[in-house]
Amino acid sequence: MSDLEPSESLNHESDSHLEQLKPSTTPSIPARPQSRPQKQTTTTTTKVPTDQDSNDKTPLEKPQDELDQLAHEIEKVLTDPVIPPRPQHGSSAKPNETQTEHKEQDFGSAHPVIPSRPTNKKETIETEMVDQNNGLESKSDSTANKESLENQVPIDEDSTHVKPSIPNVPSRPQNRDLDSSEVDNTKASTTPSIPARPQRQTAPTQNEHKPQVSNTPVIPTRPQTKTEKLHLNEELDKLDGESSSKNQENKRHTDDNNTSKPIYEAESIVPPEEKEGETANKQALPTTSTDPPAEPTASTRGFRLPLHMQQSSGPISTSTPVTGSEAELNSLDNSNTFGDGEITPGNSDTKATFKSDEDVENNNRTDSSSFDDDMETISQDQEDREEDRRHRQETTTGENVQESEDPQFETTIIESGEIEERDGDDTDSGELYSEQQQNKEKEDVVPATSTPKIPQRPPKKQSLSRATTDDSLTSLDNTSKPPKPVVPKRPTSEESSSNLEPTIPTRPSIKKAPSIGESDPEPIVPNRPGNKELESIPRDTQTSIKSKPPPPKPKKLSSKIAAFQQQLFNPMNASSEEDVGSTGSKQPEPGIRKRSTENSILSRFGGKAIPLPGMFNPNQMPKPSISHGEETSDDKEEKEEKEENVTANVPVRRTRGPRGKKLPKAVADAEIKTESRFTIESGKLWSLEFKREIKEEKEIGHSDLEKSKILVDDVEADGDGEEKAAENEVIESQENTIGDKLEHNDVVNIASAAADIDNDGDVDDDDDDDVPPEVNERFIKDEEISNVGIERTIASETTTEKHSTDEEVEEEEEELEVDSVDIPIRRVTVNTVDTIEDQKDVDDEPL
């Protein structure tokens, strides 16, 4: 509880300082809105949840109107994109006074604040992970952290302008001197930021001193603000050994600080210093994460050497715990910031919980051995800082490229080294506080002079940091675990690069440029709309391509060329015209061809069947003019006239061909005559004659005469030839009906009987005996077909006169009157019936 009370008092004092800074346009509140755009530009800074964020929630409670006014004032004051305050987010996240005061407070808690810087980067990534896992709690923390970063960003911008001239080391010892009692003094003197913020400011200032002492490139990368980077670069030379040990300690703290509860407690205990340190770390981490290739170790040390970073940029809160209360606050701050940093996927392989971070921070409290060496080297580094700043300003652009190439692997490696160093830093933290406080006081005096130069340089680095932030974050996530063992080597290379190159501070300035788009639109704003314009330009080009006019017509050839071409092609044109004229007479041919196509069936037999003589295709008929010599001569004359007409139409121009290559006249005037090799001859191939046919009379043979005589005799006998013919036909039909049973003799007998009946009226009994009974039945059936009346009369006569004589039969027949045509048939039938009946009677009678 005692630790929480000083934190509350620090928060009240930070609020009072913020109110004082509002008229000076450097209050923490306006700085927060500026840091917000920076967070938007760099994904890491936007989402980083730090102790500062938890402590910054008090200023967030203030009305938004005041915050907006302060933001506008800060933007007005910050004409240049105040990039240096980004690295100072942890150290001097608020106005220059607040930055120095916070740095002094951070010296009290220097050790915890240093890990917080690396954790700021990790916190950014971890806050994103915590937002997904923990829900609104992590989101509220991230928003509070963003606002705290925003408040710190403008302050860093102002402080960065102030700090570059003199390193923040003097302000850091002030924070160290503050300890628990001095922290209260800083609360009154610090900016209106919550006590955690001044502690974080002290932590970033200490981080600035220590990375300079360590001379590792990690520290320059961490101070995303120019001022913080300059302080870090100066302090890296002094804190080379301490930075490596503290980086290892920070890793240990982050591994232990994976739990969420101790982090919140640390934030409540040391909110001002840790939040400021974490904000600086957040800004530095996005820059380092964005610039992993440009400054590999800086980003990792921003995570894992936050003690050095905060000592160099501002008093390191983790290494400064002189008193028990300050040590606890600093350790909590370090655990919160450092644990948050490693919780992020970029710094730690697993999603670190806040509890593990608190444990690591508690371990960092005792780690002060490395800070003793840092205090010894800080005094020397402070002198070198000014020289390094000058060199860095000259070589910012070139060094940024080099740092962008290195950082990804070194960041994770440095974290492990920092954790190891932090283990022994707590013992010597008391000495470091006094030295860092003195250094911070010196820095507080000088910062106003150095501010104008640093903000100009960082915008260049802003572009680099923005380009590299996303890559660094991804690289940190992938490479955070394996490269940890290489801590000592990489920090040394980074320190050398950081001392020579102020590229790291410029990168944080790049992040600020997006946040302060109005003040520095050149580096980022014009480029982005330029890219949008480029995107819109292809659309316009597409529309223009669609609406392109037709290609321009080719220019007319010169008169000489045209004449020469005409000379070459005129004969072809004349010949083509002649062909057209000759084919004009053949225009009806298509009709004939159509006929031939219609008669496709006939065409199929071409070459297969023998054509009739004289048949040919009408299309193949020769021209009559070709056959006659006179006609061919006339055609030639017509062709010549046509050629003359064509040449007359052509403009008369002298055609100049190749000189010295004229053809002889015999060749030039040669006339080509084409004669057909076929000769046509006409003649009669076949003819037709039509004649009347002559009917030849047939010769009558002897047999025919005999037949005719028989017929004549029959006619005379019957009195009518037709009757005999009818009788013969009837007899033949009867024979057919009787079938094979009737013999020829029977038929003859019947015929003879009929003839006898016609002639004599006598009927032979022998004939009746020969007729079978079946024949009689059939004749009866045939009689039914004949007239019924006649049959009845015949039947009556036959029944009454069965056994009459021939004479009686003849008399009765004469009485009957029958048609000549029907008589013979009926007579025959009657006779047959009578004969059949007589036959039956004869059969019945006994012999």
Curated annotation (Swiss-Prot):
Residues 464-481, 747-756 have a biased composition (Low complexity). The keyword Cytoplasm applies. It comes from the Eukaryota. Residues 370-386, 417-429, 632-643, 757-772, 807-820 have a biased composition (Acidic residues). Transmembrane segments: none annotated. Residues 1-665, 716-775, 793-821 are annotated as: Disordered. Residues 653-664 have a biased composition (Basic residues). Residues 10-20, 54-78, 225-258 have a biased composition (Basic and acidic residues). It is found in: Cytoplasm, Cytoskeleton, Actin patch. Keywords: Cytoplasm, Cytoskeleton. One of its GO terms (cellular component) is actin cortical patch. Residues 89-98, 130-146, 186-224, 280-291, 309-323, 564-575 have a biased composition (Polar residues). Belongs to the AIM21 family. Involved in mitochondrial migration along actin filaments. This is Altered inheritance of mitochondria protein 21. It comes from Candida dubliniensis (strain CD36 / ATCC MYA-646 / CBS 7987 / NCPF 3949 / NRRL Y-17841).
